[in-house]
Amino acid sequence: MASSAPSAPGLAPVAKPPPPPSKVKVATATVPTNGKIKQGARPMRVSAPPVEPRRRMNPLQRLAAAAIDAVEEGLVAGLLERGHALPRTADPAVQIAGNYAPVGERPPVRGLPVSGRLPACLDGVYVRNGANPLHAPRAGHHLFDGDGMLHAVRLAGGRAESYACRFTETARLRQEREMGRPVFPKAIGELHGHSGVARLLLFGSRALCGVLDASRGIGVANAGLVYHDGRLLAMSEDDLPYHVRVTHDGDLETVGRYDFHGQLDADGTMIAHPKLDPVTGELFALSYNVVSKPYLKYFYFTADGRKSRDVDIPVGAPTMIHDFAVTENYAVVPDQQIVFKLQEMVRGGSPVVYDREKASRFGVLPKRAADASELRWVEVPGCFCFHLWNAWEDDATGEIVVIGSCMTPPDAVFNEPSQSPEEESFRSVLSEIRLDPRTGVSRRRDVLRDAAEQVNLEAGMVNRQLLGRKTRYAYLAIAEPWPRVSGFAKVDLESGTAEKFIYGEGRYGGEPCFVPRAGAAAEDDGHVLCFVHDEERGTSELVVVDAGSEAMEEVAAVKLPGRVPYGLHGTFIGANELQRQA
């Protein structure tokens, strides 16, 4: 019988960790590719498949597989989907065009050229996640449906030592690679209307017949990144995290699907933005279920990886929750207007629904609560925040202050604009939201005081050494022209002003990553890192900006050996942390 570690208050006992799963080794072979995918084209990749045994099917399974394939080609693709125009949010010609198109894997390239001077204090690796479909879509495809790929640049001693990009070897990716085509449903791009119902039935039939194995997870791990307890975790909210190791030569190696040593259910999930407390080392997280209750759960892990008991958060319907916030003592959980209604597919619509009758609200819960008895809801009318950048407690007023970007229309990322002209223009307004859990009253205001300076701000961060505490600055992507990112803004949350760094004509990037200088006294003493792509030249680089300088000057740019597609979220792992990897 496995021994158990002593249980801390509110924590479930933890079984002795099993040995780590075997590493995934990837053999590489250079294959030229322009990174473009055409509908129906064969996939192109830089890496050869990992050496792994092929799935062996018995004669009945082979017969079932052939029958299901015939139904897919004849009924679903041939009848339900043929001739149907795709919305822009599900059209591969839009979603993976230009620099959104996927690239192949690349093993470490060493000795990268640098213009300017790299600060010696940047000692570690910058890693950024993103969606990068291995196979050409067979039907609808949304950017968020792509397989997760990590891009990593190793910096040390004022040098850019290496660059590499690798797929996160999810169970889904490995099975689809073996089969040579996509067989798992694409949650946003495919699950619309009757064809979406049909594709869910195809998936269920393949799983039931043993043609594919859904028990090992169905996620793509393409969104968030966090480094906790010696592990870099790649995440998307449709699965458990995946543990990825940065090797000594700057490569990326998938260790496997990570359940925190059996503390998370094998069929469970964790959202893409868990919160790491910089003081205690605890990791706080949510998990939502779109089918059955409890629809939402809250839990946390100690610095050494011991999990708390789940707290069931009472919500009336399955709700899309991509992000949340923590303060020193509380978790702030949004329950907003984007909900899941799977029955809408039967009526020909999308299961991701903007519920105009629902009142947006935020739940305030003690961070280490054992149950939801102390949860307090505060309504915030007309508010949908896809991301929350920080939160803290205002001792003078008793309020919880939340900094987030309020998006309109709320479903802009997922669905086509409505027929209402006033709702067709996308806006993402940086907002200060004040919650009073004692009275249930909220206040909201735009952070940028000058309306003429208002820009769409989405994707970014504060100084993560101050997460959950009051911060003065936030570093956020300027999402203009939407969905491209033309630069980033350093926003002064106190004065309501912003200093902007624009990448230049025809140059676009993504989320800015703020890296504080070791031992810095000033909150903004550090550098902002971001991948930037020149669409005219077809080149990509890692731009380094001095965040503390008056004009936010670019101090260096690392020339990268290949195109880096526009992606999602990133993190910086210091050299000392790399040495302590599990």
Curated annotation (Swiss-Prot):
It comes from the Eukaryota. Residues 1-53 are annotated as: Disordered. One of its GO terms (molecular function) is 9-cis-epoxycarotenoid dioxygenase activity. Residues 1-64 form a transit peptide. GO terms for cellular component: chloroplast stroma. Its cofactor is Fe(2+). Its EC number is 1.13.11.51. It catalyses: a 9-cis-epoxycarotenoid + O2 = a 12'-apo-carotenal + 2-cis,4-trans-xanthoxin; 9-cis-violaxanthin + O2 = (3S,5R,6S)-5,6-epoxy-3-hydroxy-5,6-dihydro-12'-apo-beta-caroten-12'-al + 2-cis,4-trans-xanthoxin; 9'-cis-neoxanthin + O2 = (3S,5R,6R)-3,5-dihydroxy-6,7-didehydro-5,6-dihydro-12'-apo-beta-caroten-12'-al + 2-cis,4-trans-xanthoxin. Keywords: Abscisic acid biosynthesis, Chloroplast, Dioxygenase, Iron, Metal-binding, Oxidoreductase, Plastid, Stress response, Transit peptide. InterPro entries: Carotenoid_Oase (IPR004294). Fe cation binds at H273, H322, H387, H569. Its main location: plastid. Binds 1 Fe(2+) ion per subunit. Residues 1-14 have a biased composition (Low complexity). Has a 11,12(11',12') 9-cis epoxycarotenoid cleavage activity. Catalyzes the first step of abscisic-acid biosynthesis from carotenoids. This is 9-cis-epoxycarotenoid dioxygenase NCED4, chloroplastic. The lineage of its organism: Eukaryota, Viridiplantae, Streptophyta, Embryophyta, Tracheophyta.
